[in-house]
A protein has these predicted regions:
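Active-site-proximal acidic segments at structured loop/helix or strand boundaries
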Residues: 33
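Cleaved targeting-peptide boundary
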Residues: 18-24
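Positively charged n-region of N-terminal signal peptides that target proteins for export
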Residues: 1-4
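Hydrophobic h-region of N-terminal signal peptides that target proteins for export
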Residues: 9-18
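Well-ordered beta-sheet/strand-loop patches within structured domains
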Residues: 26-30, 40-47, 64, 68, ...
Length: 382
């Protein structure tokens, strides 16, 4: 009886030891947090049953019972696709992550597995082909993009569908791009052609003292929001224009930038000495748009004053624009009247406690009358 128990114990120990055989995949993941690049090892493993190990040792080739294990492992590994680096706000701290894609090298892994089993080892290395994303965390670090620098936000609540569509299309074109050191950000160049072929739809734009429909109506929500982010980052302005009249979507008054290619553009220079990386985000429920700027820690502090508004003027007379949704004789309010006014915003940039630059945004707005849509045959259009 004692001999039988000893034999069973030895068999269980041997079985347990054999069951410990693992296929091991080792890699690493890089992150940026609080200005530091950190690399952390990751390990994944797949168990090979003792029966499969014994069968392999017996016939000196991989047992057919291992094939389903390799199939499942391959499916898991190949499902991992490369993901470019992005920053996310995690509990108030900005963290950059990416993901390297994997593809199982099945032949090399099988060779490692067979060799390890026949050598009496309890692990074998999984071999994968790695696909590093074009924009990796390490690339961000190499370019000096280690910190969250500034944020610009705006609210487009009340926008008609066409306007929201153009805002989201425009913002997506400015999501995840670099501004090289010394390079001038050029809004019109980055956005590219604005028409149906690039995803934009027709919407109202300010033209000829009233509203008219053109491709990309609402794109100024995008230019205004990224302007706010880059202005908060302390970048010098090389070109910026205000709208001809105050537009409610762009309050605070004067803290905005209109564009109308090719005559009006937004251009600002990256003078930080390192790359800047721009991310866009939007919330279609809250109707908010946001741009975040990431780069080097320049030691700058930027203070932007509230607008000082003067020189108020009464709204202008109403104007009319064709709208085929309106019945003859009727009218539809498209835009509300606005007073004329002048807004001045002051920006003070400090470094090391000393003022290094100071500038003002002066915006002069003409009086604006209500705009009504009327039937295209309406006499008020004459």
């Amino acid at each position: 009886m004692k001999r039988l128990l000893t034999t069973l114990t030895l068999a269980l120990v041997a079985s347990a030891h054999a069951a410990d055989f693992k296929l091991i995949l080792k890699d690493e993941v890089s992150t940026i947090r609080k200005g530091e690049l950190k690399t952390t090892p990751i390990v994944k493993s797949w168990a090979v049953p003792a029966t499969s190990v014994k069968a392999t040792q017996k016939v000196k080739r991989l047992s057919t019972t291992i094939t389903p294990i390799l199939d499942r492992m391959e499916k898991t590994i190949d499902a991992r696709k490369p993901k470019p680096a992005v920053f996310r706000n995690v509990n108030g701290s900005w963290v950059a992550t990416d993901q390297t894609g994997w593809t199982l090298d099945r032949a090399a892994t099988k060779a490692n597995l067979l060799k390890a089993i026949l050598s009496g080892k309890d692990t074998a290395q999984v071999v994968v082909k790695r696909a590093v994303p074009d924009r990796s965390v390490k690339l961000l670090a190499q370019r000096g993009v280690l910190w969250h620098v500034a944020t610009g936000t705006s609210n487009y609540a009340g926008s008609p569908d066409f306007r929201e569509k153009n805002i989201l299309v425009g913002a997506s074109k400015l999501d995840n791009f670099f501004i090289a050191p010394g390079h001038e950000f050029n809004f019109n160049e980055e956005i590219g052609q604005i028409d149906a072929s690039t995803g934009f739809v027709k919407g109202f734009v300010i033209s000829g003292g009233t509203l008219s429909k053109e491709d990309g109506g609402g794109i100024c929500q995008v230019s205004t929001t990224i302007f706010r982010a880059l202005y908060q980052a302390g970048l010098p302005i090389t070109e910026r224009h205000e709208h001809s009249h105050r537009v409610k979507y762009y309050d605070p008054v004067g803290f905005e930038a209109t564009v109308y290619a090719p005559s009006k553009n937004l251009r600002m220079k990256n003078d930080t000495g390192k790359h800047l990386f721009i991310q866009a985000a939007w919330d279609t429920r809250a109707k908010t748009l946001r741009f975040d700027v990431f780069g080097a820690n320049t030691g700058r502090t930027v203070n932007i004053s509230k607008p000082v508004i003067t020189d108020f003027k009464a709204p202008a007379d109403p104007s009319y624009t064709p709208d085929d949704r309106v019945a003859p004789g009727g009218r539809r309010l498209l835009d509300t009247p606005m007073q004329g006014m002048t807004s001045v915003i002051t920006r003070t940039v400090k470094a090391g406690g000393k003022v290094v630059s100071k500038d003002t945004l002066k915006s002069v707005y003409k009086p604006w009358g209500a705009v009504y849509g009327v039937n295209p045959r309406d006499k008020r259009l004459n």
